[in-house]
A protein has these predicted regions:
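Glycine-rich active-site loop/strand segments that organize a redox cofactor
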Residues: 47-95
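Glycine-rich FAD pyrophosphate-binding loop
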Residues: 5, 21-45
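Glycine-rich loop(s) and the adjacent beta-strand/alpha-helix scaffold that form part
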Residues: 156-202
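A glycine-rich dinucleotide-binding beta-alpha-beta segment and adjacent secondary-structure elements
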Residues: 127-130, 134, 307-387
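An anion/pyrophosphate-binding glycine-rich loop and adjacent beta-alpha core
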Residues: 34-36, 41-42, 50, 56-57, ...
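Short hydrophobic core segments
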Residues: 5-7, 30, 132, 145, ...
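Feature captures the FAD/FMN-dependent oxidoreductase FAD-binding
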Residues: 75-156
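Beta1/beta-strand and adjacent pyrophosphate-binding region of the FAD-binding site
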Residues: 1-12
Length: 415
């Protein structure tokens, strides 16, 4: 019977441990925190966005950080395979807007508890509060793992330690150190799915304001580099929310270039053409012709956003509407569809939902998740140089790579 050690009890580690146990291996899951699945518990605002109902081509598209590496893993273990497995374990799921899949109970705790039950079923030994300090390699093959408490012999080790985001959940980049010690390359570690810091200070005046159904674009060198439609929010330092988090991957890449000049452009009324928006504004101005400008826009915008839009259009909010010129009205229209902020930086990696960068994929076989340098060493999940957008794509990547790594660790090329 093979002895397999899984390092890290996040989504990838839980899946790897369960599958290795199911396939007949003796499995030890080593977790440095006092519980497994800690970070999984905060995904989807504590509801656990397990996966997405999109097809696999869409998954690759929504994984800007080396998505093509996942083709093999998704062929072996797709979102449908994952849901079939979870349903067989008794978890009921539902699909929400954007194809996001959640447990029916809206409880991440239920997902974790089901994994704990299945780990027990397959006699997986779970060791909590036991960080791994090194991996032992002899003749280019894994032979053991050392923790701060014990030395373990093994036939295979699967690194599932996550990235460097949300360190309070245990993701502190330990896996990078372990992999580097045995000769692997670590690519540039940086935040992904992270809020954006802007140079403009007026954002503080509207911090907490959420906008829905807006179009947000990243612009550099006068070109739109990426755009997203949906929700966003102003904060004391800049911008956050689903659209912003997704765009942060592009912003991060641009920031690494020499002398980057990046702006974020918000279209507050993307459903309207410039002409239709102007007519809409004229209609409101006719209705409120005797009022001041600030009062004439209350049907169009959230109240606390109105002074900002007027200021950006370089107009006086107390000016009577019946004195507003056509040129001034068109300036307002322009700001409504081209509200521009300049990017200063991204928030730190500790605040990111996922980490971009990781163990270099050039050194791993995408069909097996086994190291090309060291036999019996595997990587799965966010510790690898993979990152995706929000919507269940990151968890699916973790589950799929964990599954593939476990299957090959147990069966080798015979599976």
């Amino acid at each position: 019977m093979k002895q397999i050690i899984v390092i890290g009890g996040g989504a990838a580690g839980l899946m790897a441990a369960v599958i290795a146990g199911r396939e007949g291996a003796r499995v030890i899951l080593l977790e440095k925190m006092n519980m497994v699945g800690k970070k999984m518990g905060i995904t989807g605002k504590g509801r656990c966005n397990i996966t997405n109902s999109a097809d696999m081509a869409e998954f690759i598209k929504n994984t800007p950080g080396n998505g093509k590496f996942l083709y093999g893993a998704y062929e072996r273990f797709s979102n449908e395979d994952l849901l079939d497995l979870l349903h067989s374990w008794g978890l009921k799921t539902k699909v929400e807007r954007g194809g996001r899949v959640f447990p029916e109970s809206d409880s991440a705790l239920e997902v974790r508890n089901i994994f704990m039950k299945i780990l027990k079923k397959y006699n997986v030994q779970v060791h909590l509060n036991e960080p791994v300090t090194s991996i032992t390699v002899q003749e280019n093959r894994v032979v053991g793992v050392t923790t701060d408490k014990e030395q373990y012999a093994c036939d295979a080790a699967i690194i599932c330690t996550g990235g460097a985001s949300y360190p309070l959940t245990g993701s502190t980049g330990d896996g990078y150190v372990l992999a580097e010690k045995v000769g692997h390359t670590i690519t540039d570690i940086r935040p992904s799915l992270v809020p954006i810091v802007t140079n403009e200070t007026w954002v503080k005046e509207i911090m907490g304001l959420s906008l829905r159904n807006v179009e947000v674009s990243v612009i550099s060198k006068s070109k739109v580099q990426a755009k997203q439609f949906g929700e966003m929010m102003f904060t004391h330092f800049g911008l956050t929310g689903p659209t912003i988090l997704s765009l942060s991957h592009t912003v991060g890449k641009l920031l690494r270039k020499k002398n980057p000049q990046i702006t974020i452009e918000i279209n507050l009324k993307p459903a309207l053409t410039a002409e239709v928006l102007d007519k809409r504004l004229q209609k409101d101005f006719d209705l409120y012709s005797k009022k001041q400008l600030a009062n004439g826009m209350k049907d169009l915008l959230p109240v606390n956003l109105i002074p900002i839009v007027i200021k950006l259009a370089e107009l006086d909010s107390t000016k009577p509407i019946n004195q507003i010129t056509k040129e001034e009205r068109l300036r307002l229209c322009h700001v409504l569809q081209h509200m521009t902020l300049t990017v200063k930086e991204l928030r730190p990696v500790a605040e990111a939902i996922v980490t971009a960068g990781g163990i270099s994929l050039k050194e791993f076989n995408p069909k097996t998740m086994e190291s090309k340098l060291i036999g019996g060493l595997y990587g799965a999940g966010e510790v690898l140089d993979i990152d995706a957008f929000t919507g269940g794509y990151n968890l699916q990547a973790a589950f799929s790579t964990g599954y593939v790594a476990a299957m090959h660790a147990v069966h080798g090329d015979e599976e």
